[in-house]
Regions:
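Intrinsically disordered, low-complexity linker/terminal regions across diverse proteins
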Residues: 2, 52, 195, 233, ...
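Active-site-surrounding "flap" and adjacent substrate/cofactor-binding loops of secreted or lumenal enzymes
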Residues: 2-6, 15-22, 27-91
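Flexible glycine/proline-enriched surface loops and loop-helix/loop-strand junctions
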Residues: 5-9, 150-154, 560-562
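Hydrophobic/aromatic-rich, well-ordered segments within soluble, folded domains that form packed cores
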Residues: 13-34, 156-178, 571, 578-583
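Extracellular/periplasmic catalytic domains that process cell-envelope and extracellular macromolecules
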Residues: 16-20, 134-136, 463-466, 619-621
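Pocket-edge structural micro-motifs
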Residues: 28-29, 36, 144-146, 474
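Short, solvent-exposed loop/turn elements at domain surfaces
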Residues: 32-36, 151-152, 480
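Noncatalytic, helix-rich "gating/capping" subdomain that lines the substrate-entry/channel surface
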Residues: 64-366, 370
Length: 692
């Protein structure tokens, strides 16, 4: 059968009751959502998760193969799955850490303890990593960001809506303290309540999720002297000295030498007011409160690697309360996730050999090229961009780099000291040492433009503004996103929209502040930026009005409590989605023209003519199949708890609005399904947002 006769869709699964003109998302996905029962170990399942599950099974097969070439990945996997040894050890693997915290005689001593524990996986109240400098994208620099809290974000500590979550959090902390031997029920409950008060003071200095994604506000270059002054009561010099001594005393320190103080001479602070607040917190806090914070974070940070009682208590809160899961995932599945996170490229290289055909890479590279061509036409013909900004935008687009499938520069794990004869915690300490050394040793060095931030077995994609690069790992290049045997319509609606989305991040509210070389640099005229922000404001307002159906039903008796989408938090992803669909449509039209020997023509009339000429398959036109393919990739079902958490912290909108909220702004959607003003999906023409 010819490829052109295969739609790549499953029309039999579509709704016979819901119409696409009223709810495209549920027309395509409604019957599945209504009948699919989430397994007890899942908080969410959908198109992305199905592919991740497939990759998970494939990685397991590799790790359990006696001839597995990824020996360090295999050793870590087996250490995690050896529950007999883990359960026998109890809390012993971290007892020395806790003793060191308990014995700290003053704040400086505690600072040194925290510094000594950080390289091997200990928690701290700020996070540190080495990666590209937005002001000098050719070089890496140390970045410092806020940290120090155990709930998803600062809102969980102050909003009445989260009071029940805080109660459960306190109960979890108290139980973990009892399990670690820090008193009876009454004593540990008092400690847990005090801990929440301490952590709430830290959270009060945190920036919210909208502010932390602001590229300009979070770019604050400084130096070691200024940082030391800001953290005068924390004693940064003592912390660094202890960190260095602990790191140097390990095999990783020998294999990946670094001078922490030297590389911190130039740094970027993401949230300056947080560090000032953290210093005030240290100045005002009692030593016992600081030790309590360190003690709890040491226990909860390692709980998932400790014996059953710690692991189950940790899951009861983070898995059940926050995410709604009913039971833990199988141990082997968690082991695969751990390996993917620690040394994913080690096993990923074998994954690519076994499961990624070179033909898929070639087809994807062609699709990416078509999408970039479509963006070029869209920018060139924009009716709201001035010529100066168009020129800069086209220059940036010409410098885009696409990476497909897998890296050609695999990470070297020689310094990763994971061993078959070591316990899980010891191996995880070795993994933390390796990762700290690997990341921080980049500071001051040229950026490795061949490095990937995702493993090939990851079902995702990303745009990195400081490199002006879009990356598509191998695992996402499968149905429903990409089917090499299918007609183009569903592929452009699936992976084409994803490609367009990632390219679109280069021109969203944050990515548009970086130039073609990845430098944080304003290349817009004031007039064009104002017009851009006018359009994004309209999209923000649209999304602010969206409430996920499942939460509207949950709060039906008190609708005012129903949480809604945060348009400002999700605007970057929404711009990416909207641009992705519009540009993928244009690229699909260009592909149809190319197949029929016609020259590329970006006029609306030519695009419509090309789309109308596409063959009907499975009773749908090419234009309809494009939108049906797009809706298919967002098939998702999740528990209420996770839906609420994501509304607070996730910059992505819920799946139903990544579908319906986007296509109602796309004129060709109305043409595809003959949408009328009386239909639920209708949005008046003057209210539709058009950006790219």
């Amino acid at each position: 059968m010819s490829n052109a006769l295969i739609s790549g869709l499953d029309p039999a699964s579509f709704s016979s009751v819901i119409k696409p003109v009223d709810d495209l998302f549920r027309y395509v996905n409604g019957p599945w959502i209504d009948t699919y029962r989430l397994p007890d170990d899942r908080s969410r399942y959908g198109s992305f998760d199905k592919l991740a599950e497939d990759a998970e099974n494939q990685i397991r097969d590799i790790l359990e193969d006696d001839d597995c070439p990824a020996v360090k990945s295999r050793a870590l996997y087996h250490a995690f799955c050896d529950t007999d040894t883990i359960n026998q050890a109890g809390i012993t693997p971290i007892r020395a850490d806790l003793d060191a915290i308990d014995q700290a005689a003053d704040k400086t001593s505690l600072t040194r303890v925290l510094g000594s524990l950080n390289p091997t996986g200990g928690s701290d109240q700020f996070a540190m990593a080495g990666y590209g400098d937005p002001g000098d994208p050719e070089h890496n620099i140390v970045h410092i960001e806020q940290a120090g809290i155990g709930l998803p974000d600062e809102a969980y500590y102050c909003e009445d809506h989260y009071a029940p979550v805080r109660e459960q959090y306190v109960a979890m902390v108290a139980k973990q303290l009892r399990q670690a031997g820090y008193g009876d029920e009454l004593q540990t409950e008092e400690q847990a309540h005090r801990f929440l008060e301490v952590e709430t003071r830290i959270a009060s200095h945190h920036w919210d999720n909208v502010a932390t994604r602001d590229s300009q506000k979070t770019y604050n270059p400084t130096d070691f002297a200024a940082l030391s002054e800001t953290l005068a009561h924390f004693d940064l010099a003592a912390w660094i000295g202890a960190w260095q001594a602990a790191y140097d005393a390990t095999a990783a320190g020998t294999a990946q030498s670094l001078d922490l103080k030297a590389i911190m001479q130039h740094i970027i602070v993401h949230e300056p007011s947080f560090l000032a607040g953290l210093d005030a917190f240290w100045a005002a806090s009692e030593l016992d409160d600081l030790k309590l914070w360190a003690r709890v974070h040491t226990i909860t940070g390692w709980a998932g690697m400790l014996s059953r009682e710690f692991d189950e208590t940790n899951f009861a809160f983070y898995g059940k309360v926050l995410s709604g899961a009913k039971q833990q995932r199988d141990r082997w599945k968690r082991g695969v996730s751990l390996v993917n996170g620690v040394c994913g490229e080690d096993v990923g290289r074998e994954y690519v050999k076994r499961h990624f055909p070179e033909s898929s890479k070639q087809r994807m590279e062609q699709l990416v090229g078509n999408l970039i061509d479509a963006y070029r036409v869209s920018i060139s013909t924009s009716d709201w961009l001035g010529e100066a900004t168009k020129t800069k935008a086209l220059e940036k687009l010409s410098k885009f780099t696409a990476k497909v499938g897998y890296t050609n520069h695999w990470r070297d794990y020689a310094a990763l000291d994971v061993r078959d004869d070591a316990g899980l915690v010891d191996n995880m300490r070795a993994a933390s040492l390796y990762e700290n050394g690997y990341q921080l040793s980049k500071a001051g060095q040229p950026v490795d433009r061949d490095e990937w931030l995702m493993n090939p077995q990851t079902v995702n994609a990303y745009y990195e503004p400081s490199l002006n690069v879009i990356v598509f790992p191998a695992a996402i290049l499968q149905p429903p996103f990409f089917n090499p045997e299918a007609d183009d319509a569903a592929n452009y609606g699936g992976i084409g929209a994803v490609i367009g989305h990632e390219i679109g991040h280069g021109f969203d509210d944050q990515g548009s502040q970086y130039d073609g070389d990845g430098k944080l640099n304003n290349w817009w005229t004031d007039e064009d930026r104002a017009r851009f922000e006018q359009r994004t404001k309209a999209l923000i307002e649209q999304y602010n009005g969206f409430i996920p159906r499942q939460l509207a039903e949950k709060y039906a008796d008190d609708p005012q409590k129903a949480p809604h989408v945060n348009g400002a938090l999700t605007i970057g992803e929404n711009i990416g989605d909207l641009g992705g669909v519009n540009i993928a449509l244009k690229a699909y039209a260009f592909a149809l023209d190319a197949a029929s020997g016609k020259p590329e023509d970006g006029s609306p009339e030519a695009i419509r003519a090309a789309l109308d000429a596409a063959p009907d398959i499975d009773g749908f036109t090419g234009l309809q199949r494009f939108f049906l393919g797009y809706a298919s990739i967002w098939r998702t079902k999740q528990r209420d708890e996770l839906a609420e958490q994501y509304l607070q912290i996730d910059p992505h909108s819920p799946a139903e609005f990544r579908t319906n909220g986007i296509v109602r702004n796309v004129d060709l959607f109305y043409a595809a399904f003959d949408v009328k003003p009386t239909d639920a999906m209708w949005l008046d023409h003057d209210q539709r947002v058009r950006i790219w």
